[in-house]
Amino acid sequence: MKRDTKQQIVQEVAEKISQAQGIYLTEFQGLTVEKMSELRGEFRKAGVEYRVVKNTLIRKALQDMAGADKLAPALKSTTAIAFGIDDPVAPAKVIKKFSKANDQLKFKMAAIDGAVYGADQLTLLSEMLSKTENIGRTAGLINNVIGSVPMVVNAVMRNMVCALDQIAKQKQ
């Protein structure tokens, strides 16, 4: 590979890293071309970019990232990097699901908003709610609160009317 090509790859990967909310390093040794294509398709469906890059080029691209030194030990063997641009946990869900059926795919490490997660924390990451799920839950909670406010106001007014009615009856 020519030096210009390597520099371009480093620049592209560094740009993706800066845009991504979460990056995931995986080992894919032993996956067939067919399985690798299937995996890329699953990532594409989830809105995740998945790319095979040489470890030395990933290391150079990570230089400006916080916590890059913690990711360095994972840069051994074959490495592919998944970029969670819009949703930091989408890659974890795909990796978890795909690795159940394919033992050759191994999760190495992830970095989300500066925090680094090891290979043993894939289950934790995959069970986290996605951004859209969190937005949906928050909207539901707000909707419930807004819906219950008129009932509370009506109950207070009803109680006040009852209290005034009782006072009026006592004075008669």
From Swiss-Prot:
<keyword id="KW-0694">RNA-binding</keyword>
<dbReference type="GO" id="GO:0006412">
    <property type="term" value="P:translation"/>
</dbReference>
<dbReference type="InterPro" id="IPR001790">
    <property type="entry name" value="Ribosomal_uL10"/>
</dbReference>
<dbReference type="InterPro" id="IPR043141">
    <property type="entry name" value="Ribosomal_uL10-like_sf"/>
</dbReference>
<protein>
    <recommendedName>
        <fullName>Large ribosomal subunit protein uL10</fullName>
    </recommendedName>
</protein>
<keyword id="KW-0687">Ribonucleoprotein</keyword>
<dbReference type="InterPro" id="IPR022973">
    <property type="entry name" value="Ribosomal_uL10_bac"/>
</dbReference>
<comment type="similarity">
    <text>Belongs to the universal ribosomal protein uL10 family.</text>
</comment>
<dbReference type="GO" id="GO:0003735">
    <property type="term" value="F:structural constituent of ribosome"/>
</dbReference>
<comment type="function">
    <text>Forms part of the ribosomal stalk, playing a central role in the interaction of the ribosome with GTP-bound translation factors.</text>
</comment>
<keyword id="KW-0689">Ribosomal protein</keyword>
<comment type="subunit">
    <text>Part of the ribosomal stalk of the 50S ribosomal subunit. The N-terminus interacts with L11 and the large rRNA to form the base of the stalk. The C-terminus forms an elongated spine to which L12 dimers bind in a sequential fashion forming a multimeric L10(L12)X complex.</text>
</comment>
<dbReference type="Pfam" id="PF00466">
    <property type="entry name" value="Ribosomal_L10"/>
</dbReference>
<keyword id="KW-0699">rRNA-binding</keyword>
<dbReference type="InterPro" id="IPR047865">
    <property type="entry name" value="Ribosomal_uL10_bac_type"/>
</dbReference>
<dbReference type="GO" id="GO:0015934">
    <property type="term" value="C:large ribosomal subunit"/>
</dbReference>
<dbReference type="InterPro" id="IPR002363">
    <property type="entry name" value="Ribosomal_uL10_CS_bac"/>
</dbReference>
<dbReference type="GO" id="GO:0070180">
    <property type="term" value="F:large ribosomal subunit rRNA binding"/>
</dbReference>
